[in-house]
Amino acid sequence: MKHFKLYIVAFFCILFSAEIYAEDVTYLTTEQFKTRVFDYTKNKQWKYEGETPCIIDFYTTWCGPCKRLSPILEELSEEYCGEIVIYKVDTERERELAAAFGITSIPTLLFCPVEGRPQIAKGLLPKEVLKQAIEEVLLKK
């Protein structure tokens, strides 16, 4: 019984410490997208609403390449914690948003710098290519 209690305590310590340090990918609804990224219903010209550059992953739950991209984005979220934000938009749940951006292929990534126009990349890209895009498009290094 004593060992069981120790395991429980250790489990919760690990669980909470992982949550404190991990920068998670955030899932967005259409309404959240409008306030955090761009309100396409009110503005015709692109105006990024965020203070930190972001990547938006337009995906679906059944898409094989989307599933392979997800852990890469999680890793990048941790590597660039505080420098960029990574959002995910489920195109089947947020059809209006996907249609507004002309998303016809998944995964599609939208790279949004704080200043300037966003850039789109389609398909499953290697981590190194994504890192290069983050450095050049979002962080302007």
Give residue spans per PLM region.
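N-terminal signal peptide c-region/cleavage motif recognized by signal peptidases
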Residues: 17-18
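Conserved helix-turn-beta segment immediately C-terminal to the redox Cys motif
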Residues: 51-53, 68-89
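Bacterial N-terminal signal peptides that target proteins for export
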Residues: 1-8
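A short beta-strand-turn-helix
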Residues: 28-52
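Structural microenvironment flanking redox-active thiols in thiol-disulfide oxidoreductases
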Residues: 89-100
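Conserved redox-active cysteine motifs that mediate thiol-disulfide chemistry
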Residues: 58-72
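Short pre-active-site segment immediately N-terminal to redox-active cysteine/selenocysteine motifs
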Residues: 51-54, 58-62, 105
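Non-catalytic, surface beta->alpha helical segment in thiol-disulfide oxidoreductase systems
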Residues: 105, 110-141
